[in-house]
C-alpha cells in the first residue's frame, strides 16, 4: 500500500483500502458474494403482467360478469324459435366481446393515463400534504391536551366527584300498595 492506493489480489486499484470482508460491490467473502447473487431486485414499473388472469385480486367478481343468461331469459311456456335463441345468444356474446375490445382500444390508454395521473396526484398529496398535516396537528394538539388535562383534573374531577357523592346518598324505596 503506497500513497493511499491499494491493489487487491486481482490487480484492481482502490484509493481506500478494502476491508477484509470486501465491500458491497466486490465482496471478498464467498458467502456474501453468493448472497448478493441470489437477491433479485424487482422493479414495479417493469414487472411482467399476467395476460391470462387479468384480475388476480378479484376486483370485478361481482360486478362485470354479465352473460347472456343474466340479461335475457325466456320463462317456461314462452320460448322463441331455437334458431332465434341461438342467434340472439351469439349476437349478444360477440357484440359484447368486440365492442368491449373496441372501447378498450379507443379509450383504454387515455383512461389509464388519466387514472395514473389521478392516483399519482392522490399519492403525492397523501405523502406530502395529508400525513405532514396530521403529524403537525398531533404535535400541536399535545400542548392543548396537557392544558385540557390539567383543567379536567383541577376543576371537573372535584366537581363531578362532589356531585357523585351528593347523589350517592339518595335512596329510593318503592312500595306497591294494593
UniProtKB/Swiss-Prot annotation:
It is found in: Golgi apparatus membrane; Cell membrane; Membrane, Caveola; Membrane raft. Residues 2-104, 126-178 are cytoplasmic. GO terms for biological process: caveola assembly; cell differentiation; negative regulation of endothelial cell proliferation; receptor internalization; regulation of cytosolic calcium ion concentration; T cell costimulation. A lipid is attached at residues 133, 143, 156 (S-palmitoyl cysteine). Residues 131-142, 167-178 are annotated as: Interacts with SPRY1, SPRY2, SPRY3 and SPRY4. GO terms for cellular component: caveola; endosome; focal adhesion; Golgi membrane; membrane raft; perinuclear region of cytoplasm; sarcolemma. The modification N6-acetyllysine is found at residue 5. The keyword Repressor does not apply. It is a peripheral membrane protein. Phosphorylated at Tyr-14 by ABL1 in response to oxidative stress. Ubiquitinated. Undergo monoubiquitination and multi- and/or polyubiquitination. Monoubiquitination of N-terminal lysines promotes integration in a ternary complex with UBXN6 and VCP which promotes oligomeric CAV1 targeting to lysosomes for degradation. Ubiquitinated by ZNRF1; leading to degradation and modulation of the TLR4-mediated immune response. InterPro entries: Caveolin, Caveolin_CS. Residues 2-94 are annotated as: Required for homooligomerization. The keyword Lipoprotein applies. Its main location: Golgi. Keywords: Acetylation, Cell membrane, Golgi apparatus, Isopeptide bond, Lipoprotein, Membrane, Palmitate, Phosphoprotein, Ubl conjugation. The modification Phosphoserine is found at residues 2, 9. The modification Phosphotyrosine is found at residues 6, 14, 25. Residues 149-160 are annotated as: Interacts with SPRY1, SPRY2, and SPRY4. Pfam families: Caveolin. There is a cross-link at residues 5, 26, 30, 39, 47, 57 (Glycyl lysine isopeptide (Lys-Gly) (interchain with G-Cter in ubiquitin)). The modification N-acetylserine is found at residue 2. Residues 105-125 dip into the membrane without crossing it. Residues 82-94 are annotated as: Interaction with CAVIN3. Belongs to the caveolin family. Homooligomer. Interacts with GLIPR2. Interacts with NOSTRIN. Interacts with SNAP25 and STX1A. Interacts (via the N-terminus) with DPP4; the interaction is direct. Interacts with CTNNB1, CDH1 and JUP. Interacts with PACSIN2; this interaction induces membrane tubulation. Interacts with SLC7A9. Interacts with BMX and BTK. Interacts with TGFBR1. Interacts with CAVIN3 (via leucine-zipper domain) in a cholesterol-sensitive manner. Interacts with CAVIN1. Interacts with EHD2 in a cholesterol-dependent manner. This is Caveolin-1. It comes from Muntiacus reevesi (Reeves' muntjac).
